[in-house]
Amino acid sequence: MNSNWNSIRGEKFGRQSWLVIITALLIHGVQAGTLLKRIHVDHAFRYQGNEEWEIVIHGNDGDDDLDPDETVMVVFDRPFPQEGGRATRPSSEQWNFLGVAGNEDVWIIPQNFTPLIWPGWRSEGAFATYYNDDARLGFSAPFVGISVENVGYSGLGAGHYSMWSNQTGGITKVWISTADGISEDDVYYFSSGHSHTNQGFSDPGVYRVAYRATGFLANDGGDPPTGTRLVASQLQSFYYALGTYAEWKATYFEPHELVGSSSSDPVPEATRYTGDSDGDGIPLLLEYAFNLSPAESDYRVLTPDSGERGLPSVRLDESTAQPRLVIEYLRRRAEGAPRLSYYPEFSSTLESVWAPAGAESVFPVDSIWERVVVVDEAIEHADTVRFGRVRVELR
């Protein structure tokens, strides 16, 4: 996804000219949901009788329950398992269900404990024991099934979701994989009332995964028993933000604004890369790139030498014998895994090829941001007209 800075400044010595290219989409602002980053919670499905279910994000350790429609679980785009969820897929074919090729990145919420986001599975209700003839089971227990019925995704990749368990003896039991589509086999069964699985995501972005719980309230008393009186919950979506850009968007927008309500729906207008939810003329991707807010109209240009937010500053430096065009801009530091590339460029005309800037000077601002200064070295004589811009690419 490429997006060019929407203000291009040109300088001719003795006069200044601006060319401003702005496309504004006026969209009402929204309020963000709750972000979960370092906490043990559960996807909780509570059968309350009379065909009624309560579905919440259960807070363990005394934490309050949360509404899944107002909550986003965040997976950091940092190395697994100590810092985040980004791992490398093994080359063996048994891992094809992850939806990425061998030795490529995949993002994981682990089955085993992590101090980062650690969502488990919880069922509550008087469910009956029955024999489950699923090839992955083949025994009797009071199973509850959690099926995936659709997955929405907003990002640059394919957006595949998977779930599997690590079994005794090194066995990997795959429950759900959307890499080959969604079928009636994409169900996770558990019987303990509480459990954990591995969850996999093929790409950074925002995922909306819609689950449905099922269970039997009775059985026929046979040997083995057959379940009777099947009950099924309503379909409930849970939201996951994978990576820094997705987390940033979730800070400002409600979960339903981050991704379509079904796998076939487009990304909501407010959170498209080119969206302008606050009506200030700055596309969403550039708000992310230059430390601006998509929730308030805060159009500004960076203050040279001291600014901490704003679009790139393009100015004429006349402190030397040969004046030079200077671009100064904010850049997200690589340590924060922003998946952004910044390309400062110069040109003599808006119609010609833009040339990349040369050497840069970098000044740290804080743990997230740094200030970058580049100088145009291509000016040949005093009547030269030069333009500067910063092009931004999300990877």
Question: Could you say what each language-model-derived stretch is?
Answer:
Residues 17-28:
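Bacterial N-terminal signal peptides
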Residues 195, 203-207:
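Short tyrosine-centred short linear motifs in exposed loops/low-complexity segments
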Residues 219-235:
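Beta-sandwich strand segments
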Residues 33-193, 228, 241-243:
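Phosphate/adenylate-binding glycine loop and adjacent helical scaffold
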Residues 244-395:
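Short, composition-biased motifs enriched in small/polar/acidic residues
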Residues 207-215:
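A short beta-strand micro-motif common to beta-rich folds, especially ectodomain repeats
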Residues 1-14:
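N-terminal secretory signal peptides that target proteins for export/translocation
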